[in-house]
Amino acid sequence: MSSPLKNALVTAMLAGGALSSPTKQHVGIPVNASPEVGPGKYSFKQVRNPNYKFNGPLSVKKTYLKYGVPIPAWLEDAVQNSTSGLAERSTGSATTTPIDSLDDAYITPVQIGTPAQTLNLDFDTGSSDLWVFSSETTASEVDGQTIYTPSKSTTAKLLSGATWSISYGDGSSSSGDVYTDTVSVGGLTVTGQAVESAKKVSSSFTEDSTIDGLLGLAFSTLNTVSPTQQKTFFDNAKASLDSPVFTADLGYHAPGTYNFGFIDTTAYTGSITYTAVSTKQGFWEWTSTGYAVGSGTFKSTSIDGIADTGTTLLYLPATVVSAYWAQVSGAKSSSSVGGYVFPCSATLPSFTFGVGSARIVIPGDYIDFGPISTGSSSCFGGIQSSAGIGINIFGDVALKAAFVVFNGATTPTLGFASK
């Protein structure tokens, strides 16, 4: 599921004059990746998206869209009233800060085709399509994204009769046709990968010039290509990996690292605790064993949810969320800004979630997403209610607090370790 969420970049001419405003284009960032670290083992880092600015209400709206939930009027109003330039909090006074002060500004360079065309994609464990803006995308729906041009790739082949379509909660959709082509990430190469070329793109993606497309890492049963579903990049890569795993080590105020085919034992502390995964819906769905707020007592309760790198925030049951914000003086749920806000002068408590008998602690700083607008004394919270979405989502707020193993063996599991 995931998110939709945020990112951005700068300029480059599109071949063939697909756009009338080439100054809005950007060049894909060169790969910032380590070479192959051993047979069947690959490691690469995300890179900072220098132009993205976090917008709380828009982040919540994108999550609704991603999961196909209609947008409530109050949330749409909050998005319309919001501004995109948020500043980092500074002991009560809002100050302008570099964009990397908010952990929603990282993207992953991916090479597609021969010769390689570099696009910056959102690695999304909440979806299963690899789709991109392309030379086939309606010109008016491209606004700053780098595009994939199949005709410039000698290895691109149209998958005859294949189409894809993803519908969103506001009734919009993204859709197009399908090519197979060579796709490489950090030295890990898959030939004949299904690359879904967008002919039509939802406005929520057009408005987000930071993302050139998505690389889905959920289960292939969630793929939307018809008449025959296509495998994800991970599923296609498994045969060449030393082990059928990938790991996410997302950073706080820093780029994260994805590893494929191995587990870096230096990236975490203690041991990894594994938990069962339900693949019924095609997601990395698991059940947390409970939670604690700050130094409070751990409350044992089952919280079923999805591990979703493509969603920025942590969405939990309303009772859990209200229990957290009740510990922050002045915090309140505000429909006018799309969720819980709190005084920027407040020090947020940590939030702990259970993985089996293990405990993963999210520091309070991770939950602070800065002033709701430049100069505001109210800040946007990183823990929000899942009530309107219908599913709990362990997004990046939770995942960056842990080293996470996505084990794609015959019986999939998720592993969490402190770091």
UniProtKB/Swiss-Prot annotation:
Family, similarity comment: Belongs to the peptidase A1 family.
Coiled coil: none
Pfam families cross-referenced by the UniProt entry: Asp
Top EC class, one word: hydrolase
Gene: EAPA
Active site: D124, S288
Removed propeptide positions: 21-89
Keywords carried by this UniProt record: Aspartyl protease, Disulfide bond, Hydrolase, Protease, Signal, Zymogen
GO function term, MF aspect, one: aspartic-type endopeptidase activity
Record-linked PANTHER family: ASPERGILLOPEPSIN-1-RELATED (PTHR47966:SF2), BETA-SITE APP-CLEAVING ENZYME, ISOFORM A-RELATED (PTHR47966)
Signal peptide positions (record): 1-20
Disulfide cross-links: C344-C379
GO process annotations (BP): proteolysis
Occurrences of domain Peptidase A1 (ranges): 106-417
PROSITE patterns documented for this protein: ASP_PROTEASE (PS00141), PEPTIDASE_A1 (PS51767)
Known catalytic reactions: Hydrolysis of proteins with specificity similar to that of pepsin A, prefers hydrophobic residues at P1 and P1', but does not cleave 14-Ala-|-Leu-15 in the B chain of insulin or Z-Glu-Tyr. Clots milk
EC number, as in UniProt: 3.4.23.22
Protein name: Endothiapepsin
CDD domains reported in the protein's UniProt record: Aspergillopepsin_like
